[in-house]
Amino acid sequence: MKRTYQPKKRHRQRVHGFRKRMSTSNGRKVLARRRQKGRKVLSA
């Protein structure tokens, strides 16, 4: 059986990246929460 996680750089960025987060209002809320929490890394 193959493993379920087959990493791809492009897919990771397009689904979870900073620009994707910034492109929607809810995504911006995610970034705001992570800034407030003090996350060192905001997005993938």
UniProtKB/Swiss-Prot annotation:
One of its GO terms (cellular component) is ribosome. Residues 1-44 are annotated as: Disordered. InterPro entries: Ribosomal_bL34, Ribosomal_bL34_CS. GO terms for biological process: translation. Residues 1-22, 30-44 have a biased composition (Basic residues). It holds the Pfam family Ribosomal_L34. The keyword Ribosomal protein applies. GO terms for molecular function: structural constituent of ribosome. Keywords: Ribonucleoprotein, Ribosomal protein. The keyword Cytoplasm does not apply. Disulfide bonds: none annotated. Belongs to the bacterial ribosomal protein bL34 family. This is Large ribosomal subunit protein bL34. It comes from Pediococcus pentosaceus (strain ATCC 25745 / CCUG 21536 / LMG 10740 / 183-1w). The gene is rpmH.
